[in-house]
Every structure is written in C-alpha cells, then in structure tokens.
UniProtKB/Swiss-Prot annotation:
Belongs to the class-II aminoacyl-tRNA synthetase family. Type-1 seryl-tRNA synthetase subfamily. One of its GO terms (biological process) is seryl-tRNA aminoacylation. Keywords: Aminoacyl-tRNA synthetase, ATP-binding, Cytoplasm, Ligase, Nucleotide-binding, Protein biosynthesis. Catalyzes the attachment of serine to tRNA(Ser). Is also able to aminoacylate tRNA(Sec) with serine, to form the misacylated tRNA L-seryl-tRNA(Sec), which will be further converted into selenocysteinyl-tRNA(Sec). Pathway: Aminoacyl-tRNA biosynthesis; selenocysteinyl-tRNA(Sec) biosynthesis; L-seryl-tRNA(Sec) from L-serine and tRNA(Sec): step 1/1. One of its GO terms (molecular function) is transferase activity. It comes from Bacillus cereus (strain ATCC 14579 / DSM 31 / CCUG 7414 / JCM 2152 / NBRC 15305 / NCIMB 9373 / NCTC 2599 / NRRL B-3711). The gene is serS. This is Serine--tRNA ligase. It is found in: Cytoplasm.
Length: 424
C-alpha cells in the first residue's frame, strides 16, 4: 500500500509513474474525490460533535437552574442525527478509499527499466556455458518417466492435471535439493531457517498483496476462510505483522521451505507438461526485513544468494532486470533469475527477487524504531526464491542428461544422494 499522505501531495507524479506499469488507472482518479470527501466529512463531524458537547453542557446548566431546556434538547437530537448520518457516510467513504488504496500497485523504482512487456526486460548478466548436445536432448518429463522417477499419469488419476508423484531417486533428488539449499542459505548466507504454516488467514494474504486483487489465483478453504499459501513469503512476512521491531534486530533474514499452491488461473494451455507449472510445488524462499536505506543493497545480496545455488549446481542462467510493465503488483524493483532449459531452447524463470520497499510493511503494519522512544517507521521487505525446487529438478534432468537417458548427479548434491553419481 502506498503512503496516503505521499499520494495526496504527489498525485500527478505517482500517476505518471504508475502509467509506466501499463495499469488500468480508471479507478485511480477517484482517489482525490474520495480523499477530499473523507477530509470534509471528518471536519464536519468534528464540528458537529463539538457543538453537541456545547449544547449538552448548556442543557446541564439549564436543568441545574430548573429552566426550560426543551428547545436545546431538540437541537441536540437534530445534531445527533446529523452526526450519525455523517458517520455512516464517512464509514462508507473510508471503506471505498481503503479498497482503492489496496488496489493501487507499488511505484516502480527509478532504476527499473521502463517498458510494457517481458520483451522490454533487460539482461543484467549471464553465467555459465550452455551445453551443446551432439544428440537431440529429451524434455525432462520424458527422461523422468523413462527412469521411473516422476509419475504424472498416476498423479492425474489421483488428483488432476498439474500434479506429480516423485518416486525413488526423483523423490531423493527433490529432498536433496531442499536440504542443500537450506544448508547453503543458513550456514553460508546468514539466514535463519523457518518452517511456516501452509495455511494463512485473509489478513495475511492482504498484508503481502495477494488479496484482494489476486484472489482468483488462490486456493481458498471456505469453511475457515483460510488460504493455501502461494509462497512462503506470505506466512513468513506476516510473522511480524502488527509489530514494532528494534533497530538492532534489523536486518532479519529468513529462509523457509514450504510447499506452494497456485491455481494458475491465467495459465490455461501453457506449460501443460512437466514440472514448470504445477498447482503444488516445493520452494525455498528468502525473506528480509531491513532499514529503508539498506534495502537496495540487500536486494543485490539476496539475488546473489539465489544465484549461488545455480552456480554450485553448475547450471547456466541469466539475471533479468524486470521492466516497469512486468514488475508485478507489489515490487518496486525485481530481478528474475532464469535457468537454461534445453528442451525449450531458452531460459525459464526459476527465481524472482524483489524489493517491495514499504509497500507490504504498510499493508501489514510492520515497523521499527531507530531509538527506544523514537517514532516508528515502516521497514522495507524483500523476498526471493532460493530456489523453486521443481524447476531446479527439471533443469538438472535436462542439462545433466546423457545420450542413454541416464542423469549425472551434480557433484554438490552427491553427499545428499548417498554418494550416488548417476540416476539410471
């Protein structure tokens, strides 16, 4: 959520920056109307309440003096009715304003490339050499099915499309990657491990920006009004909702493994085979709470931490600086890390690393004090995938495949795989 005072005093500047996102700003113009009316109603209500108090005191005086107070009593009733009507209108205006504020996306950072679509994203850097195959590389779903380590068909029978059973060496590879990533981020990168709930309430989904705008993308448990988490970012960020932190606690860095659940409502017909786009998938998420002046340095560190996973796995990748039209709703700046997938002949996203500045913290009321008695300020929050496990499995299967269909296990994972070197 944006700062309403900043929006009020910089309305045209904010509008111009949001236009770079390519957002429909039809409702945005109502901000000035609603904000002005809200302030008018506050003034009118306070004036009438003040008058009501004065009249009440006058009535008390007249009654003590045993004088007729009927006219003033009628006047106070009229004032009370007006106050009630104004309070009702104020409540409606504030609810409308709140809904509008929750629907306004974050302001792009000045360093985000200006553009409309993913074609306008900018390559920040690349790492590793793309392998040249002397044979036609197989897609990971064919490799895994032939090896008996992934079973999409039976998962479709048990649940439906976009689900999978991991079996044997496939299940162990998934588990190895989870442990490897958590060990790396906690032991070498300084994150504290967190294992979060997989269900959250509506306030949590609103705090991180999934609601109200993207409710159709979420799996909701109607009986409890809980939501299955689309990412560990949601519960982990909301750990500190409605809290005031001390300056000494910052930065806070969490690494959280979780399963993630997404309806993929807007992805019909895309990536229908394999592990790239599943309704349920595993991910290690990195979440940070930092002082505002440190957040862009911390974004670079977070992105580097996610990159390190791919470097140790020796998987070629590139880092994209996302343009203003491809930032997503909550980010002020975002990097996507894309790993090379041979069967696609291109790079595919495996991590998004974002700085939300105070956007989430304002929605979730997460603040800190620089001094013990200082005025609370909103922290800046960041998060990034470190990494998406299923897509990492897909990248390993395809990049490490041999002509006979076996898979070389990356050296860094072998201790987690019982010393095995090949999946066959």
């Amino acid at each position: 959520m944006l700062d309403i005072k900043f929006l009020r005093t910089n309305f045209e500047e904010v509008k111009a920056k949001l236009q770079h996102r390519g957002e429909d700003l039809t409702d945005f113009g109502r901000f000035e109307e609603l904000d002005t009316r809200r302030r008018e109603l506050l003034v009118q209500t306070e004036e009438l309440k003040s008058k009501r108090n004065e009249v009440s005191q006058q009535i008390s005086v007249l009654k003590r003096e045993k004088k007729d107070a009927e006219a003033l009593i009628l006047e106070m009733r009229e004032v009370g009715e007006k106050v009630k009507d104004l309070d009702n209108e104020l409540r409606t205006v504030e609810e409308d304003l709140e809904r509008l504020m929750l629907s306004i996306p974050n302001i792009p950072h000045e360093s985000a490339p200006v553009g409309e679509t993913e074609d306008d994203n900018v390559v920040a850097r690349t790492w590793g050499e793309v392998k040249e195959f002397t044979y036609e590389p197989k897609p990971h779903w064919d490799l895994a099915t032939d090896l008996g380590i992934l079973d999409f068909e039976r998962a479709g029978k048990v649940t439906g499309s976009r689900f999978v059973f991991y079996k044997g060496a496939g299940a162990r590879l998934e588990r190895a990657l989870i442990s490897f990533m958590l060990d790396l981020h906690t032991d070498e990168h300084g994150y504290e491990e967190v294992l979060p709930p997989y269900m959250v309430n509506r306030a949590s989904m609103t705090g991180t920006g999934q609601l109200p705008k993207f409710e159709e993308d979420a799996f909701r448990i109607e009986s409890e009004d809980y939501f299955l988490i689309p990412t560990a970012e949601v519960p982990v960020t909301n750990m500190h909702r409605d809290e005031i932190l001390n300056k000494e606690q910052l930065p806070i860095r969490y690494a959280a493994f979780s399963s993630c659940f997404r309806s993929e409502a807007g992805s019909a017909g895309r990536d229908t085979r394999g592990l790239i786009r599943q309704h349920q998938f595993n991910k290690v998420e990195l979440v940070k709470f930092v002082k505002p002046e440190d957040s862009y340095e911390e974004l670079e560190k977070l992105t580097n931490d996610a990159e390190r996973v791919l470097q140790l796995l020796e998987l070629p990748y590139r880092v994209m600086s996302m343009c203003t039209g491809d930032l997503g709703f909550t980010a002020a700046k975002k990097y996507d890390i894309e790993v090379w997938i041979p069967s696609y002949g291109t790079y595919r996203e495996i991590s998004s690393c974002s700085n939300f500045e105070a956007f989430q913290a304002r929605r979730a009321n997460i603040r800190f004090r620089r001094e013990p008695n200082g005025k609370p300020e909103h922290v800046h929050t960041l998060n990034g995938s470190g990494l998406a496990i299923g897509r990492t499995v897909a990248a390993i299967l395809e990049n490490y495949q041999q002509e006979d269909g076996t898979i070389i296990i990356p050296e860094v994972l072998r201790p987690y795989m019982g010393g095995k070197t090949v999946i066959k």
